[in-house]
Amino acid sequence: MCAAQRSAAALAAVAPRSVYAFSARPLAGGEPISLGSLRGKVLLIENVASLUGTTVRDYTQMNELQRRLGPRGLVVLGFPCNQFGHQENAKNGEILNCLKYVRPGGGFEPNFMLFEKCEVNGANAHPLFAFLREALPTPSDDATALMTDPKFITWSPVCRNDIAWNFEKFLVGPDGVPLRRYSRRFLTIDIEPDIEALLSQEPSSA
């Protein structure tokens, strides 16, 4: 049974209210980073893969957003995942070299935060992604987006709010609350107006 099928009362009793309840270990190793340390920042969270057909497009656009908007308070977070077509089959220690020499290649280096490989769907999903999927069950640009090809579904249980492929995006406000989810087809760079709107808001007096 999907977590989404549990009673609303049970979920309300235990569910975190923001991403600040979660932590993740950086790709380079070391101690887990609490997302609470990013309080007040606008976050763009993506499940990434280094061998996907859109790796070049999305990684370079993630870099561009971080470069342009990072000084104003945007933090881009990438979470490698091998659940979609086995397109992140490298070990954690190999991913940066894959990005540098293969895709995007040409010496590419991500300027945003990358974390260790994790699962985003199923019983072993990283708690952050389980939370994001509950908070935003479908992409705002394509509410029908879901994985429909059985040969690519390698996780269990299968839920309606599952991430459908690499490079789905979650935009999180400066209070840590998820605001919008975008499908893999929505260009990363086209999220810029939504990010700009959040960065332009006056800080809450609460």
UniProtKB/Swiss-Prot annotation:
GO terms of biological process kind = arachidonate metabolic process; glutathione metabolic process; hydrogen peroxide catabolic process; lipoxygenase pathway; response to hydrogen peroxide; response to selenium ion
Q: Enzyme class, one word?
A: oxidoreductase
- Catalytic reaction list: 2 glutathione + H2O2 = glutathione disulfide + 2 H2O; a hydroperoxy polyunsaturated fatty acid + 2 glutathione = a hydroxy polyunsaturated fatty acid + glutathione disulfide + H2O; tert-butyl hydroperoxide + 2 glutathione = tert-butanol + glutathione disulfide + H2O; cumene hydroperoxide + 2 glutathione = 2-phenylpropan-2-ol + glutathione disulfide + H2O
The UniProt keyword set, sorted, is: Acetylation, Cytoplasm, Lipid metabolism, Mitochondrion, Oxidoreductase, Peroxidase, Phosphoprotein, Selenocysteine
Q: Name one GO molecular function term.
A: glutathione peroxidase activity
The EC number(s) given in the record are 1.11.1.9, 1.11.1.12
Q: Name one GO cellular component term.
A: mitochondrion
| Keyword Phosphoprotein carried by entry | yes
One Pfam assignment:
GSHPx
Q: Which residues carry this modification: Phosphoserine?
A: S37, S200, S204
Locate the active site. U52
Give the record's subunit note: Homotetramer. Interacts with MIEN1.
Task: Output this protein's name.
Answer: Glutathione peroxidase 1
